Regions:
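Short, surface-exposed loop/turn segments at beta-strand-coil junctions that are enriched for proline
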Residues: 77-81
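Intrinsic-disorder/low-complexity, polar/charged segments enriched in Ser/Thr/Lys/Arg/Asp/Glu/Gln
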Residues: 37-41, 69-73, 97-99, 326
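A short beta-strand micro-motif common to beta-rich folds, especially ectodomain repeats
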Residues: 82-94
Length: 451
């Protein structure tokens, strides 16, 4: 979007060869254009970087009597992913029109990305690329909502596809607090992994009954109908054929899945009775069934994981560096409602490592991604970030991270907004997430994404 605004100062109808100058770069700036006939301020507001024609192509207004308002119109000749050329045309009664050709050299977007055209909260954002589309999966009250978009940086309005059951004689395990759904295309079906519990029933006031469950699509269309496939076993005493219940499992949230060498695994955040949230793993016999006892991979022990005394590892996300043969579990640490929320990782050698052996996983020596602007309402900023997932640019050439950031340093759970940004890789095969993007900071569009 390019907007130009003009204000006249002692404007003389006898313009006398009044010149509108093209500058080399127009980027959130203003320009005073003047001569003996008066002056005109040209304000430029843009969400991109622009370049103009060189000085040799400056245009002048012929001497003539001008009157009335100056009209400005811009039209584009092309729409591409690398540049876009536009013509700015200035007209006024009695004055020959003036045209300026401007080339938009880089297309940009800003965070937080919009949802249905609006800036809105989206904690634990999950966006997955499948074919030409990006699918967004999010909690919507006590339901799961999904949408589809051709663009990573624009989330279309979501539609609720499934809701938690109500309380009844069977006392369902999953009637409240639907958290962090994740969407996967496995074989010819789609699956959603989510957490829920029974808070508010039977005298339960906390979140200790949170367990992980799975939904399966009835067709190969994630925007179609879904069916509940039940709770997943997240305990430490697995027996073949065991039926998962709240009694024989433990607190389990943020479950995700990956496959390595033909074996599928479930990874989640869980704890027992000591309130220490750990990253845990188990094997799966199919996308709806965990087939082993859980194994603990990570316990929060580092100072940067326990900054306010609470011990939390959660939000595991799978990231693979195929070229270097590395598989990462990128997780969040510290409380999600605080400005200390950040990312770290566990790394496995995909060639020689056993995902079920904690000794084969290497923890990052420090946190890997964080930002805190310490802004308080009404000043927007980035104050703690985490609970991520990963995807590719539309043309598949770039790696992108999706995460949420808190708007205010004391914003809590209610101020988490969706962010996306490109990341790269270090020479040793570990991810380089760089610095968290700022609130409203222009970033280049993902490669292959058009407006």
């Amino acid at each position: 979007l390019l907007c130009l605004f003009g204000h006249a100062h002692a404007f003389n109808p006898d313009l006398g060869n009044f010149r509108i100058e093209c500058i080399n770069r127009l980027n959130f700036s203003e320009k005073m254009v003047s001569n003996s006939a008066g002056s005109l301020e040209v304000f430029v507001s843009s969400n991109t970087e622009w370049t103009s024609e060189p000085r040799s192509k400056w245009l002048s207004v012929d001497r003539s009597g001008g009157k009335g308002d100056l009209a400005v119109r811009i039209s584009f000749e092309e729409n591409g992913t690398e540049k876009r050329t536009g013509i700015v045309r200035f007209t006024a009664d009695g004055v020959n029109p003036v045209e300026i050709i401007i080339t938009q050299s880089a297309l940009t977007f800003t965070n937080p990305i919009t949802i249905g055209g609006n800036i809105a909260t989206m904690p634990d954002p999950y966006i997955v690329k499948d074919g030409d589309y990006y699918y967004t999966c999010k909690a919507s009250g006590n339901g799961i909502a999904i949408s589809r978009s051709m663009r990573l940086t624009v989330v279309n309005a979501t539609t609720k596809k499934w809701s938690l059951p109500y309380e009844g004689p069977s006392k369902p395990w999953n009637i409240a607090d639907l958290w962090a759904p994740e969407l996967f295309h496995i074989g010819d079906r789609w699956y959603v992994y989510y957490a829920a519990g029974r808070r508010g029933q039977d005298g339960i006031t906390g979140y200790g009954t949170q367990r992980s469950g799975v939904l399966r699509s009835k067709t190969d269309d994630p925007l179609g109908e879904w069916e509940d496939m039940g709770m997943l076993y997240t305990g430490y005493d697995y027996q073949p054929g065991i039926k998962p219940t709240a009694a024989n499992t433990e607190y389990a949230i943020d479950l995700t899945t990956f496959e390595l060498k033909g074996q599928r695994y479930a990874v989640w955040s869980g704890n027992g009775t000591d309130a220490v949230q750990q990253i845990r793993i188990a094997t799966m016999s199919d996308p709806c069934t965990i087939s082993s006892s859980m194994v603990i991979l990570s316990t929060p022990t580092q100072s940067w994981e326990t900054m306010d005394g609470r011990k939390i590892n959660e939000g595991p996300a799978i990231l693979v560096n195929e070229e270097k043969g590395k598989l990462f579990i990128v997780y969040s640490c510290n409380p999600s409602w605080t400005k200390n929320y950040r990312l770290a990782w566990l790394m496995l050698d995909m060639n020689d490592g056993d995902p079920m052996n904690p000794a084969d996983w290497q923890k990052s020596s420090n946190y890997a991604f964080w930002r805190c602007d310490n802004t308080k309402e009404p000043v927007s900023g980035v104050n703690g970030l985490g609970h991520c997932t990963f995807t590719k640019s539309p043309d598949g050439t770039e790696d992108w991270i999706v995460y949420h950031a808190m708007r205010y340093s004391d914003g809590g759970w209610g101020q988490r907004y969706p962010f996306v940004q490109k990341f790269t890789w270090n020479a040793d095969g570990t991810p380089d997430f760089g610095e968290g993007a700022g609130w409203g900071e222009p970033l280049l569009l993902p490669s292959g994404e058009t407006l």
